[in-house]
């Protein structure tokens, strides 16, 4: 099983898809990575040679932040917004949508399950 950036890549998937299992690498970045290393997108991850794996590893480590580093950076950005008291930080602190979505209805994912108000009768 091929292992890149601390993630086990699925053996039977095409490399173009398998690379997207790494946090921080989506479809576009996956294609770009395969072009840089000269690996066919149709190749299965089980068929990768050690040289190809090391080439992928080098490009990923030297070009982008992925997995743990990226997650830590995102969390640090959120903490910074909360500390400086920005509007976005306030929304994060209150557990509400940050990017201007409506909250009168919807936003249940962010707000959690409904809190029933006692004594409200029809």
UniProtKB/Swiss-Prot annotation:
Record region (Disordered): 93-122
Presence of the UniProt keyword tRNA-binding in the record: yes
PROSITE patterns hit by this protein: RIBOSOMAL_S13_1, RIBOSOMAL_S13_2
GO cellular component, one term: cytosol
Keyword line: Ribonucleoprotein, Ribosomal protein, RNA-binding, rRNA-binding, tRNA-binding
Signal peptide residue numbers: none
Top-level taxon in the UniProt lineage: Bacteria
Coiled-coil annotated residue ranges, if any: none
Pfam families: Ribosomal_S13 (PF00416)
Record-linked Gene3D superfamilies: 1.10.8.50, 30s ribosomal protein s13, domain 2
GO annotation terms (biological process): translation
Disulphide-bridged cysteine pairs: none
Listed GO MF terms: rRNA binding; structural constituent of ribosome; tRNA binding
Biological role stated in the UniProt entry: Located at the top of the head of the 30S subunit, it contacts several helices of the 16S rRNA. In the 70S ribosome it contacts the 23S rRNA (bridge B1a) and protein L5 of the 50S subunit (bridge B1b), connecting the 2 subunits; these bridges are implicated in subunit movement. Contacts the tRNAs in the A and P-sites.
Quaternary assembly: Part of the 30S ribosomal subunit. Forms a loose heterodimer with protein S19. Forms two bridges to the 50S subunit in the 70S ribosome.
Similarity remark: Belongs to the universal ribosomal protein uS13 family.
Name under which the protein is recorded: Small ribosomal subunit protein uS13
Organism of derivation: Corynebacterium jeikeium (strain K411)
């Amino acid at each position: 099983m091929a292992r890149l950036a601390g993630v086990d890549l699925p053996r039977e998937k095409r490399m173009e898809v398998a690379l997207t299992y790494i946090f921080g690498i989506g479809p576009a970045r996956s294609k770009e990575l395969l072009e840089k290393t000269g690996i066919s997108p149709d190749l299965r991850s089980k068929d990768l040679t050690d040289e190809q794996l090391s080439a992928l590893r080098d490009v990923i480590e030297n070009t982008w932040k992925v997995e743990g580093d990226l997650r830590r950076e995102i969390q640090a950005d959120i903490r910074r917004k909360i500390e400086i008291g920005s509007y976005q930080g306030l929304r994060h602190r209150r557990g509400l949508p940050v990017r201007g979505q409506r909250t009168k209805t919807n936003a249940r994912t962010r707000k959690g399950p409904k809190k029933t108000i006692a004594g409200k009768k029809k």
